[in-house]
Regions:
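Conserved beta-hairpin
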Residues: 30-44, 201
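Conserved beta-strand-loop-alpha-helix junction that forms the acyl-donor binding cleft
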Residues: 90-100, 118
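Short hydrophobic/aromatic beta-strand or adjacent loop that forms the aromatic wall/cage
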Residues: 30-31, 121-127
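Conserved acetyl-CoA binding element of GNAT-fold acetyltransferases
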Residues: 49-61, 91
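Conserved acetyl-CoA-binding loop-helix of GNAT-fold acetyltransferases
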Residues: 59, 65-78, 105
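Conserved GNAT acetyl-CoA-binding A-motif
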Residues: 80-94
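Short amphipathic alpha-helix that is part of the acyltransferase structural core
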Residues: 1-26, 139-143, 150, 154, ...
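Conserved acetyl-CoA-binding loop of GNAT-fold acetyltransferases
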Residues: 104-114
Protein backbone atom coordinates (compact mmCIF):
# COMPACT_ATOMS: atom_id res chain seq x y z
CA UNK A 1 0.00 0.00 0.00
CA UNK A 2 1.26 3.47 -0.80
CA UNK A 3 -0.13 7.02 -0.53
CA UNK A 4 0.05 8.94 -3.81
CA UNK A 5 -1.02 12.29 -5.25
CA UNK A 6 -2.52 12.68 -8.70
CA UNK A 7 0.07 12.99 -11.48
CA UNK A 8 -0.22 12.52 -15.23
CA UNK A 9 1.46 9.12 -14.92
CA UNK A 10 -0.93 8.03 -12.17
CA UNK A 11 -3.92 9.23 -14.20
CA UNK A 12 -2.76 7.02 -17.05
CA UNK A 13 -2.35 4.00 -14.77
CA UNK A 14 -5.79 4.54 -13.22
CA UNK A 15 -7.40 4.85 -16.65
CA UNK A 16 -5.79 1.58 -17.69
CA UNK A 17 -7.28 -0.19 -14.67
CA UNK A 18 -10.69 -1.85 -14.58
CA UNK A 19 -12.30 0.55 -12.12
CA UNK A 20 -15.89 1.64 -12.69
CA UNK A 21 -16.26 5.00 -14.52
CA UNK A 22 -17.83 6.64 -11.45
CA UNK A 23 -15.05 5.55 -9.12
CA UNK A 24 -12.37 6.49 -11.65
CA UNK A 25 -13.81 10.02 -11.90
CA UNK A 26 -13.53 10.40 -8.13
CA UNK A 27 -9.94 9.16 -8.12
CA UNK A 28 -8.88 11.57 -10.85
CA UNK A 29 -10.34 14.51 -8.91
CA UNK A 30 -9.02 13.46 -5.50
CA UNK A 31 -6.54 15.13 -3.12
CA UNK A 32 -4.66 11.88 -2.58
CA UNK A 33 -5.12 8.12 -2.76
CA UNK A 34 -3.93 4.90 -1.23
CA UNK A 35 -3.27 2.31 -3.94
CA UNK A 36 -2.38 -1.37 -4.15
CA UNK A 37 -0.51 -2.70 -7.17
CA UNK A 38 -0.01 -6.19 -8.56
CA UNK A 39 2.42 -6.77 -11.44
CA UNK A 40 2.71 -2.98 -11.79
CA UNK A 41 -1.06 -2.62 -12.26
CA UNK A 42 -3.36 -0.84 -9.81
CA UNK A 43 -5.81 -3.40 -8.42
CA UNK A 44 -7.27 -1.36 -5.57
CA UNK A 45 -7.60 2.26 -4.54
CA UNK A 46 -9.07 4.44 -1.81
CA UNK A 47 -9.49 8.17 -2.46
CA UNK A 48 -10.03 11.37 -0.48
CA UNK A 49 -11.26 14.45 -2.30
CA UNK A 50 -13.31 17.62 -2.22
CA UNK A 51 -14.16 20.06 0.55
CA UNK A 52 -16.13 17.36 2.36
CA UNK A 53 -13.27 14.84 2.16
CA UNK A 54 -15.35 12.42 0.13
CA UNK A 55 -14.00 8.90 0.53
CA UNK A 56 -14.49 5.66 -1.39
CA UNK A 57 -12.84 2.31 -2.09
CA UNK A 58 -12.86 -0.05 -5.04
CA UNK A 59 -11.03 -3.33 -5.55
CA UNK A 60 -10.73 -5.10 -8.91
CA UNK A 61 -13.14 -8.06 -8.83
CA UNK A 62 -10.58 -10.89 -8.90
CA UNK A 63 -8.79 -9.43 -5.87
CA UNK A 64 -11.87 -8.87 -3.70
CA UNK A 65 -12.32 -10.78 -0.45
CA UNK A 66 -8.64 -10.57 0.50
CA UNK A 67 -8.91 -7.77 3.04
CA UNK A 68 -7.36 -5.19 0.69
CA UNK A 69 -10.18 -2.69 1.25
CA UNK A 70 -9.56 -2.41 4.98
CA UNK A 71 -5.80 -2.10 4.45
CA UNK A 72 -6.29 0.70 1.93
CA UNK A 73 -8.69 2.48 4.28
CA UNK A 74 -6.33 2.10 7.24
CA UNK A 75 -3.60 3.73 5.15
CA UNK A 76 -5.93 6.61 4.25
CA UNK A 77 -6.97 7.12 7.87
CA UNK A 78 -3.33 7.25 8.96
CA UNK A 79 -2.57 9.82 6.25
CA UNK A 80 -5.61 11.92 7.21
CA UNK A 81 -4.43 12.04 10.81
CA UNK A 82 -0.95 13.12 9.68
CA UNK A 83 -2.52 15.91 7.63
CA UNK A 84 -4.83 16.85 10.53
CA UNK A 85 -7.96 16.25 8.44
CA UNK A 86 -11.00 16.39 10.74
CA UNK A 87 -13.25 13.84 9.05
CA UNK A 88 -13.98 11.60 6.07
CA UNK A 89 -17.39 11.28 4.41
CA UNK A 90 -18.86 8.65 2.17
CA UNK A 91 -22.04 7.22 0.68
CA UNK A 92 -23.14 3.58 0.75
CA UNK A 93 -25.89 1.59 -0.88
CA UNK A 94 -28.00 0.07 1.94
CA UNK A 95 -27.66 -3.34 0.30
CA UNK A 96 -23.87 -3.29 0.71
CA UNK A 97 -24.08 -4.68 4.25
CA UNK A 98 -20.53 -6.04 4.35
CA UNK A 99 -19.05 -2.63 3.55
CA UNK A 100 -21.35 -0.89 6.04
CA UNK A 101 -20.38 -3.29 8.84
CA UNK A 102 -16.67 -2.97 8.02
CA UNK A 103 -16.81 0.82 8.07
CA UNK A 104 -18.91 1.08 11.25
CA UNK A 105 -16.42 -1.16 13.05
CA UNK A 106 -13.69 1.31 12.09
CA UNK A 107 -15.73 4.19 13.51
CA UNK A 108 -17.89 5.50 10.66
CA UNK A 109 -21.22 6.93 11.80
CA UNK A 110 -24.41 6.50 9.76
CA UNK A 111 -25.91 9.97 9.34
CA UNK A 112 -29.04 9.81 7.21
CA UNK A 113 -30.72 8.19 4.21
CA UNK A 114 -31.40 10.11 1.01
CA UNK A 115 -33.62 8.87 -1.82
CA UNK A 116 -31.54 9.84 -4.86
CA UNK A 117 -33.67 8.85 -7.87
CA UNK A 118 -35.77 5.93 -9.13
CA UNK A 119 -32.77 4.17 -10.69
CA UNK A 120 -30.25 4.62 -7.87
CA UNK A 121 -32.78 4.27 -5.06
CA UNK A 122 -31.72 5.24 -1.57
CA UNK A 123 -28.22 5.87 -0.23
CA UNK A 124 -26.76 6.23 3.25
CA UNK A 125 -24.47 9.18 4.02
CA UNK A 126 -21.72 8.38 6.55
CA UNK A 127 -18.93 10.22 8.36
CA UNK A 128 -15.74 9.22 10.17
CA UNK A 129 -14.76 12.01 12.62
CA UNK A 130 -11.15 12.24 13.78
CA UNK A 131 -11.35 15.11 16.28
CA UNK A 132 -13.77 17.41 18.09
CA UNK A 133 -14.43 19.42 14.94
CA UNK A 134 -15.34 16.24 13.08
CA UNK A 135 -17.55 15.03 15.95
CA UNK A 136 -19.35 18.37 16.05
CA UNK A 137 -19.99 18.16 12.30
CA UNK A 138 -21.32 14.61 12.71
CA UNK A 139 -23.83 15.78 15.34
CA UNK A 140 -24.88 18.70 13.16
CA UNK A 141 -25.41 16.51 10.08
CA UNK A 142 -27.67 14.14 12.03
CA UNK A 143 -30.29 16.87 11.62
CA UNK A 144 -30.72 15.60 8.06
CA UNK A 145 -32.02 12.33 9.53
CA UNK A 146 -35.24 14.17 10.43
CA UNK A 147 -38.09 14.77 7.99
CA UNK A 148 -37.53 18.52 7.78
CA UNK A 149 -33.77 18.04 7.70
CA UNK A 150 -34.05 15.59 4.81
CA UNK A 151 -36.11 18.13 2.89
CA UNK A 152 -33.54 20.87 3.53
CA UNK A 153 -30.73 18.55 2.41
CA UNK A 154 -32.58 17.81 -0.85
CA UNK A 155 -32.93 21.55 -1.49
CA UNK A 156 -29.28 22.27 -0.68
CA UNK A 157 -28.05 19.34 -2.78
CA UNK A 158 -30.11 20.48 -5.77
CA UNK A 159 -28.76 24.02 -5.51
CA UNK A 160 -25.15 22.83 -5.12
CA UNK A 161 -24.96 20.89 -8.40
CA UNK A 162 -22.69 23.46 -10.14
CA UNK A 163 -20.21 23.14 -7.25
CA UNK A 164 -20.33 19.37 -6.72
CA UNK A 165 -16.87 18.70 -8.17
CA UNK A 166 -15.24 20.97 -5.60
CA UNK A 167 -17.35 19.64 -2.75
CA UNK A 168 -17.08 15.88 -3.30
CA UNK A 169 -14.45 15.49 -6.07
CA UNK A 170 -17.00 14.36 -8.62
CA UNK A 171 -18.26 16.10 -11.75
CA UNK A 172 -22.04 16.52 -11.55
CA UNK A 173 -22.20 16.12 -15.34
CA UNK A 174 -21.02 12.53 -14.89
CA UNK A 175 -23.41 11.77 -12.04
CA UNK A 176 -26.81 10.19 -12.31
CA UNK A 177 -29.29 13.07 -12.11
CA UNK A 178 -30.66 13.84 -8.66
CA UNK A 179 -34.48 13.66 -8.65
CA UNK A 180 -35.67 16.33 -6.23
CA UNK A 181 -39.31 15.24 -6.46
CA UNK A 182 -38.38 11.64 -5.70
CA UNK A 183 -36.22 12.70 -2.77
CA UNK A 184 -38.83 14.88 -1.06
CA UNK A 185 -41.65 12.38 -1.58
CA UNK A 186 -39.71 9.61 0.19
CA UNK A 187 -38.24 9.60 3.66
CA UNK A 188 -37.05 7.16 6.29
CA UNK A 189 -34.65 7.38 9.20
CA UNK A 190 -31.32 5.67 8.62
CA UNK A 191 -32.10 3.19 11.40
CA UNK A 192 -35.23 2.15 9.49
CA UNK A 193 -33.21 1.75 6.29
CA UNK A 194 -30.94 -0.76 8.00
CA UNK A 195 -33.88 -2.50 9.65
CA UNK A 196 -35.58 -2.96 6.28
CA UNK A 197 -32.44 -4.49 4.80
CA UNK A 198 -32.12 -6.92 7.72
CA UNK A 199 -35.66 -8.17 7.10
CA UNK A 200 -34.67 -9.40 3.65
CA UNK A 201 -31.38 -11.05 4.65
Amino acid sequence: MVIVSITNQLKKELQESNFSPLFLENCLNSKFLSIKQNDKKIIGACFVGGTFNSNGIEIIKEFQGMGLGKKLLDEIISECQKRKISFLMGVFKPTNKISIKTHTKIGYRLLFTIFYNHQEGKEIVVILPFNLQGKFLAKFLKFFDTRIGNLIFAILFSLSQPFIKGLIAFDSQSMSKFDFGYAVSHYEKVSQTLSNIDKFN
